[in-house]
Amino acid sequence: MSNNDKNVVGRLRKLIGEGRYSPGDRLGEVAVAEQLGVSRTPVRLAFRTLEQEGLLQQAGKRGFMVREFTQADVHCAVEVRGVLEGLAARHLAEQGLPPDVDKELSFWIQKGKKLIAKGYLVESDINQWSELNAHFHGIIIHSIGSGVVADAIARNNHLPFAAADSIIIDSDDLEREFKKLQLAQFHHELIFQSLKRGEGARAEMLMREHALIGLRYPELLADSE
C-alpha cells in the first residue's frame, strides 16, 4: 500500500472515529473521493481495508456503510488484543529472545528513537510510525513458535479499532500527537528491555498496558492540561 493509500485509510478511519460518518451511513466512492480531494482508486482500497478492520460493511453490490458498534465494543476488543499480545510477549521472554529476533526488534526500536528524537512530527512521520509499529508488534506475535496467538489476534482485528495499526493519529494536531507517540515509543523500549531480560510477567503487563494508549491517552492528556 502506497503512502497516499495509507493516508486515505487514516483519514477515513479518523472521520469514522470522530463520528463524522455515523453507524448506518452509506458511503459512496465518488462522494468520499470528492470530500477528501483524491481519486476513486485509493478510496476503493480504503473501503476494503476498513471493511477488514470491522469499521465498514457491504451494503448492496458495490456500496459500503458504517458498521454499528459501541464504545464498549471498542474497549473490549482493544483489551482482548492487549491480553493476547501480552501472552505472546510473556512466552517470548520466557523462551529467551533469539539473536535474530533481538536484532529485528532493535532495528525498529532505533527507527522509533530516531523519529522521536527530533522533538516534533511532520505528516510523513505518521506512515513511518505506522510501519515500525506494525513490525514491532508483528515480530513479537510471530516469534513464539506457535500460530495460535497470531490467529486469535487476526480474528480480533476484524473488530472496530482493535488492530495495533488502527490507531488514530490526528494530522491536524501533530504537536499533541507527538506526545502520544513519545509515550508509545517509551513503551516499546520498556517491552524490548523486559524481553531481553527474560522478564515474562513484566513483558506481559507492559504489553497489555501499551494496547490501551489509544483509549486512555486523551483522558491522560486532558488531566495534564
PLM features: residue spans?
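Short linear motifs at protein or domain termini
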Residues: 1-95, 148, 220-225
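C-terminal all-alpha effector/ligand-binding and dimerization domain
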Residues: 165-225
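A ubiquitous short alpha-helical element
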Residues: 71-75, 93-99, 120-125, 171-180
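Short, flexible helix-adjacent loops and helix caps
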Residues: 17-21, 89, 93-97, 117-121, ...
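Solvent-exposed, amphipathic alpha-helical segments
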Residues: 11, 15, 83, 87, ...
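A generic short alpha-helical patch detector that favors 3-5-residue windows
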Residues: 4, 76, 80, 100, ...
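Conserved amphipathic alpha-helical segments that form helical-bundle/coiled-coil interaction surfaces
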Residues: 99-168, 187-190, 202-213
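Short, flexible turn/loop "capping" segments at secondary-structure junctions
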Residues: 58-59, 133, 183-185
